[in-house]
Amino acid sequence: MMGKGFLDCESLVALQEMALHPIDLTASGCLSEERIQKNSLSAEGFTYSYATERVDDRCLEALQGLTEERELIKQMECMQQGAIMNRIEGFQSESRPVLHTATRAWVRDQDLHEEAAAIARHSKEEALRLAEFLYIARAKFSTLVQMGIGGSELGPKAMYFAMQGSCPSDKRIFFVSNIDPDNAAEVLREIDLEQTLVVVVSKSGTTLEPAANEELFRQAYQNKGLSIAEHFVAVTSQGSPMDDKSRYLEVFHLWDSIGGRFSATSMVGGVVLGFAFGYEAFIEFLQGAAAIDAHALTPKMRENLPLLSAMLGVWNRNLLGYPTTAVIPYSTGLKYFTAHLQQCGMESNGKSISREGKEISFRTSPIIWGDVGTNCQHSFFQSLHQGTDIVPVEFIGFLHNQRGLDCVLSGSSSSQKLFANLVAQSLALAQGRDNANSNKRFKGNRPSSILVAQQLSPRIAGSLLAFYEHKFAFQGFCWGINSFDQEGVSLGKELATQIIGIMSGNAPVEFSEARGMLRLFNVLT
């Protein structure tokens, strides 16, 4: 199903030769209007510009060839139809399908195979139950606290703030994720418990962080003499320890084939987004994601937004050797989006073992980081322009703000100034500027792309979420790694359990290294 191995692809050999002398973006006339128009793609409400990437037609043709040799579209089709994509062949692994796309497939007409169709059907059933629940809950409660960690917090939180500016709401939303009790204490100080719905999210029903925070909140409700069962909602898998209607006002379900970092379009995001903005806004969000799911099956790379972005990322990472990628949204609504992308990209593709269980000898996921523009222009952009490391930048922008507030100063509005800064940074990174004063010299040839929509609406938020989900999936397919497990988080959790045992006096085994550390910090005597 994966075609040739990544390093065996003929297209990769051609790309390696091209990478020795990539296009010079600083050359006079390089960024002509013809190049800018040609190296762009408009689809599904977005315009994507990659004229400031160090690629030319020959390079793009070779990248298209690489997508064909690695059968990336076929792999995407298999994933969306329910093939077993989460596995390591010949080794014990989760061996599951990957069906986050099915959680929104029901909002559009799509022929699905049995496994995917079942998840789509169950997702629709859960959504209809959610609509009934919200009718009562939104009338009764003014506040919602979501408890979860990783994908149970990062995606829903990013999408809540992305939609907040375009969806008027009188609801107050808080997120509690860290096991640090100060996180819970901060939120408890801000809320009226009687008016608050607490949503606890854990697929397994045993995740340490939400379990600990749920206990803190249950104690707070008990101390106030309030009915716990009338204020707590669970989102978990069927049959988990949390799947207990006697302990919760309502229980919503998700499935093993829905990974945490891909779960925002399931009830993991549905309850909080539906409560905050209404059921219709949640459906619009799903429709945006579903539109990109269909678009991601477009065969030609230069007509497929997430595939094109993925392959430009492969070019920057594997051929030009850049170790990090900055994602810079010029939108306050996306202030938590990069944190979600860090998990979605790095937990998916931060792997060094192939799907055949073999050590790989090439680079996989770059470090993903970033912040909101224009703020970050005044913090780390100095390094982007003149630092010793070249960092590809993915700019995200909108032609109109969400809330409608604006003013004109010195002949231009704040929204115009914001967008002008986005374009200026991309051009400055690409073109640079020569100067006899070496301290004022900008070398240029620092690649970037720009993804622009009219406005950050619920539909565009869903599309943006799915765009990056599929970008990272395509990259994992290209590299031949399993983008859908996260074994890297398990070792630290196992050791933490042992250390907790030492600290509580119930250590089952000797762990001299941990004891030494604990004594150093005066935790043990």
Swiss-Prot record:
Active site: E347, H378, K493
Known EC number: 5.3.1.9
Keyword Transmembrane tagged: no
CDD domains cross-referenced by the UniProt entry: SIS_PGI_1, SIS_PGI_2
Reactions accelerated catalytically: alpha-D-glucose 6-phosphate = beta-D-fructose 6-phosphate
GO CC, one annotated term: cytosol
Cellular location(s): Cytoplasm
UniProt pathway: Carbohydrate biosynthesis; gluconeogenesis; Carbohydrate degradation; glycolysis; D-glyceraldehyde 3-phosphate and glycerone phosphate from D-glucose: step 2/4
GO biological process, one term: gluconeogenesis
Key words, A-Z: Cytoplasm, Gluconeogenesis, Glycolysis, Isomerase
Domain of life: Bacteria
Protein name: Glucose-6-phosphate isomerase
Parts of the chain that traverse the membrane: none
Its job: Catalyzes the reversible isomerization of glucose-6-phosphate to fructose-6-phosphate.
PANTHER family: GLUCOSE-6-PHOSPHATE ISOMERASE
GO molecular function: carbohydrate derivative binding; glucose-6-phosphate isomerase activity; monosaccharide binding
Family classification: Belongs to the GPI family.
Predominant location: cytoplasm
